[in-house]
UniProtKB/Swiss-Prot annotation:
EC number: 4.3.1.12
Protein name per Swiss-Prot or TrEMBL: Ornithine cyclodeaminase
Keywords: Lyase, NAD, Nucleotide-binding
Function summary: Catalyzes the conversion of ornithine to proline, with the release of ammonia.
Pfam families reported in the protein's UniProt record: ArgZ-like_C_1st, ArgZ-like_C_2nd, Saccharop_dh_N
Taxonomic source organism: Archaeoglobus fulgidus (strain ATCC 49558 / DSM 4304 / JCM 9628 / NBRC 100126 / VC-16)
CDD domains found in the cross-reference section: SDH_N_domain
Protein residues bound to NAD(+): N233, A234, D312, T344, M345, L346, H347, D365, D388, V389
């Protein structure tokens, strides 16, 4: 048997961290011996645990320690981080460390350095005395890359000290929840976050246009509750189609009936915007008179439209190189405190992979599996609201305005 001592510190009981640690050891056929366990006596007091973890051999023990490391386990002996040079551009040394989306620190030069721009499934490099989390495609030959878990500390999220909608939801997904109560709680979170100067990003799919939630999202942008819009070609095209023709995918938004020749409207829309020189120019020329993109431009709210192989056109502002789009999205998400994902599974998962675990994340979709897939792919902090986005957004805006009136 091989053994290694590890320790945990934080809200180990109410955040279920210690329970998860024991489950990991047992699920991987390991053994443990608890040496010390100090329980915090008050709500804000951290707990501390120290134990010996046993594995059959070095490889088995290393497997267990890797999983424990992801939830905050650390080696009591302070060790310097291990580094190895990248042998070529986009090529990593053996045993390179793969990040989680939790706040991470590395021990370098006798100091704990915070890892900047943390997100999941990336690597850590040391450059000019600072630690950076970067994707594989940004690694260059000679970069000093972190290998192994020595000298790396992960701080997993803990249960909030006060009751919030995120504690109320508990990260679970169910359609059997009081939807209006949840939306009211989310509205309160949004209102209080903006009072503190926080920033909110919205990830939206074209269903926002098709379900007539467009006006509510445009109003949220106009009233200053949205600081960043992340979407694709379709949302912008159909939003502008509504502004020009009053249809979305050829359906009359007011009457709910197809319009003769309406199936061509989105193509006419794209052509008009391209001819005008882009969305901003089309607004300046009076072609686009209202809607989501109109409010973004008029209120200087940045937007990033990422392209896909399904796109018609696309619009001039759409970034067709997905790697460039991902990089721009990552840069734009710096400083964002909350992300609201609206009826777009693939875009939601893509953005979720770029977020640190401390960013509040709300995913709204009719399909419960969308939220489940988002969390299964690592965005465990997300809460799910299983409802029609066409009902959610107007009610959310109404609740925010009610809170404004009371304050």
């Amino acid at each position: 048997m091989k053994a290694r001592e590890v320790e945990f510190e934080g809200h180990l009981i109410d955040s279920m961290i210690f329970t998860k640690a024991l489950d990991i050891i047992l699920d991987l056929d390991g053994e443990f011996e608890i040496l010390e366990f100090r329980v915090g006596k008050k709500k804000d007091d951290p707990s501390y645990a120290r134990m010996i973890v046993f594995g059959r051999d070095d490889a088995h023990l290393e497997q267990i320690l890797k999983e424990l490391h992801k939830i905050g386990a650390r080696i009591p002996d302070i060790e310097e981080v291990e580094l190895a040079e990248a042998p070529a551009d986009k090529v990593l040394p053996d045993g390179f460390y793969v990040t989680t989306n939790h706040p991470t620190f590395v021990r370098y030069g006798g100091e704990w350095l915070p890892v900047e721009d943390i997100s999941m499934d990336r690597v850590i490099v040391i450059r000019d005395g600072r630690a950076y989390c970067i994707p594989i495609d940004e690694v260059v030959r000679g970069d000093r890359v972190v290998v192994g878990e020595k000298g790396v500390r992960v701080v997993p999220p803990e249960r909030p000290r006060k009751s919030t909608v995120f504690e109320f939801m508990g990260g679970r997904v169910s359609s059997e929840r009081p939807t209006e109560r949840m939306i009211e709680a989310i509205a309160r979170e949004i209102y209080e976050l903006k009072l503190k100067g926080g920033k909110i990003a919205v990830v939206a799919g074209p269903a926002v246009d098709h379900t007539s939630a467009r006006n509510a999202l445009a109003a949220l942008i106009r009233d200053g509750y949205v600081d960043l819009l992340l979407s694709g070609n379709a949302l912008a095209v159909h939003d502008i189609e509504i502004s020009i023709f009053g249809t979305s995918l050829g359906m009359d938004i007011c009457k709910g009936r197809p319009v003769p020749g309406g199936n061509r409207h989105h193509l006419y829309t794209i052509s008009k915007v391209i001819a005008a020189g882009g969305i901003k120019k089309a607004i300046e020329k009076g072609i686009i008179k209202d809607g989501i993109m109109y409010e973004c431009v008029k209120n200087n709210v940045p937007f990033i439209l990422a392209g896909s192989i399904r796109d018609d056109g696309p619009l001039p502002e759409v970034i067709t190189d997905v790697m460039v789009a991902k990089k721009k999205m990552k840069e734009a998400l710096r400083g964002i405190n909350m992300v609201i994902m609206l009826a777009t599974m693939l875009h939601s998962i893509a953005v979720g992979n770029l977020l640190p675990s401390y960013v509040k994340t709300i995913c709204v979709d009719m399909n419960p599996s969308t939220v489940t897939k988002l969390m299964d792919r690592g965005t465990h902090q997300a809460i799910g609201v299983v409802t029609d986005v066409g009902l959610f957004l107007p009610l959310l805006y109404l609740k925010i305005k009610e809170i404004e009136a009371k304050e």
